[in-house]
Every structure is written in structure tokens, then in C-alpha cells.
């Protein structure tokens, strides 16, 4: 099955300084799902970036990188002010949901326990699946953002279990997707989409070249394969 490829303008879980200049390359590669994180650039730059992505006709994502309630609340307010299409990440729906109410923003929090930066998914597969089930049952949670390849265990099995548990709500797999075999595993397990940032910027995929437009074109082709 095909999955949505979400290009994140991030490196090592931070929005890159030249993110605005990279958007035309992503659009030229046919990417129509583009996101960034709430750290790495000041708010004014994030607003300009969001406007450019929207003007290009792409769906706009913001992924939260917050380790405490206050910063997660601030991130949700940034998402609301920017008018993103999808807010991904975070672990505190009671903090975020009141802020997003009435905005039309789709919300995909992280299941499981997230620690550190860059973020790591801890716990067992069972506890992560239980967390996913609880989150997906909440009104206002539209899907999940699963840091599957930041988990020490059977990753394809975890993705499949989470996808089956929360269906029909979509699961996006994020973090450390840096090789073709991982994209194939994500799709086979039933995830609706996946994010790539650092790996594309580093030229990690076996595309025609390490140029970003070639990397993104290659990843988009892999995502669209049935």
C-alpha cells in the first residue's frame, strides 16, 4: 500500500536554518506534505515558512518537541497561531486539546513514553500499544505519531500492532527513517504515512545523487509504490 511521505525541514530534531530556501526544492520533487518542528527558528521565521509551504499547495505539519507541560502548551499555541493543518507529537492531550478546539487542526500525539532529545520511545510494545489505544479513544485525537525506529525492539511488529489497534485512525511513523527497507516495512505494517528529514538532507538514500531534490524524488517514489 502507498503511504504519505512527509518531508520534515529538520536535522537532528531541529528546524534547519535554511528551511525556507528548501521548500521550493521539496515542491519541485512533488512533495505535498511538508513540516517542521517548533524549535530551531524564531516564531517570525516559522510564520514565513508556514506561509511559503501553504502557498505551494502543500499540507502543513508542525511536530512538537516538548519535555514539559508548559513548553507543550506553548507549542500548541504556536500551531494554532500558524494555522497548521496537522499538529504531531507531544504527550499531553489534556493540555493541547483545549487550545486546538475549534481550529480545525488535526492532532496526532505520541503514544508511549518519550524521553530525551532527540526523542526516544521507551517501554515495552505492550505498554506502547496500550498508550496508543487510550490516546486514540480521545475526542480530538485524529491519529498518532509513532516514534517506531526510536524503540528498542521489533519495530515492524510494533507498527503493525499500533495500526491495527487504533484503526481506522491513521498512524504516522516518525524518526530515524533513513533507508529504503524501513520505508517498505512501514508501508507493509499499514502506516498511513512517515516522516523523513535528516536522512534526506544528509543524502542517505540511494537516489540519483545526494542533492535534496533527488533524495526527495526517490523517497516519494518509494512511498507511492503499492
Q: What function would you assign to each model-found segment?
A:
Residues 1-61, 66-70, 76-83, 133-137, ...:
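Conserved N-terminal beta1-alpha1 strand-loop-helix module at the mouth
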Residues 3-10, 32-36, 60-64, 86-89, ...:
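Hydrophobic faces of well-ordered beta-strands that scaffold small-molecule active sites
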Residues 82-95, 139-151, 176-178, 182, ...:
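Glycine-rich phosphate-binding active-site loops on the catalytic face of alpha/beta enzymes
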Residues 27, 54, 101, 187-188:
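Anion (oxyanion) recognition and catalysis
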Residues 51-59, 96-107, 114, 166-173, ...:
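Short acidic, glycine/proline-enriched helix-loop-strand junctions
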Residues 57, 65, 70-151, 165:
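Conserved anion-binding
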Residues 7, 115-119, 202-206:
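A short acidic, helix-capping loop that chelates divalent metal ions and anchors anionic groups
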